């Protein structure tokens, strides 16, 4: 049995939602969590910067002797995962594949599925979510919306006030009549 910890990386504290779910599913596993709050947010950075920051996070986790790395950040997954996963001997996974695989099962027989995605502008611009959905659910109609204010608001703890509600309401105007809404960033 491999007793090494699982490494988990995010651009901030949003990945703690992934951490909590992994701990619930795998209660006997140890997890090393790295939240890069110093250089947050990633959503407005260039792809090259995100790849470099992701490599630095992975390098830190490798030094912690982890057996697996979970990129618990939608932006880093969509912009850097494909670039970094073959650079290391430790398996590296992100949040996009498992989410879309779940939706593939759900919408396998639905030719009219409408899927909405909200995430950072960089995540939406990368088309990571959209490409995976089109690969696994080709008939799906996709509505994607960059929401640059949500991650900073979540980091500040502004999640249950009038400003948050009005901001979310504005972002969701285009998401009417969807079957599923993907929160494409972990915040």
Task: Please describe what each predicted stretch is.
Residues 1-186:
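Non-catalytic structural scaffold of enzyme domains
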């Amino acid at each position: 049995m491999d007793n090494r910890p699982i490494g988990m990386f995010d651009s901030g504290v949003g990945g703690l939602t992934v951490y909590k779910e992994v701990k619930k599913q795998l209660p006997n596993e140890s997890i090393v969590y790295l939240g890069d709050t110093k250089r947050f947010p990633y959503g407005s950075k260039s792809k090259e910067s995100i790849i470099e920051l992701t490599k630095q996070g992975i390098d830190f986790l490798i030094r912690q002797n982890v057996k697996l790395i979970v990129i618990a950040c939608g932006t880093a997954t969509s912009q850097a995962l494909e670039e970094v996963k073959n650079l290391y001997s430790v398996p590296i996974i992100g949040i996009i594949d498992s989410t879309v695989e779940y939706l593939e099962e759900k919408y396998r027989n639905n030719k009219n599925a409408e899927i909405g995605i909200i995430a950072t502008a960089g995540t939406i611009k990368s088309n990571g979510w959209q490409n995976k959905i089109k690969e696994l659910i080709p008939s799906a109609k996709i509505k994607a919306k960059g929401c640059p204010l949500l991650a900073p608001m979540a980091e500040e703890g502004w999640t249950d006030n009038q400003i948050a509600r009005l901001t979310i309401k504005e972002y969701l105007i285009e998401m009417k009549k969807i079957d599923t809404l993907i929160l494409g960033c972990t915040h």
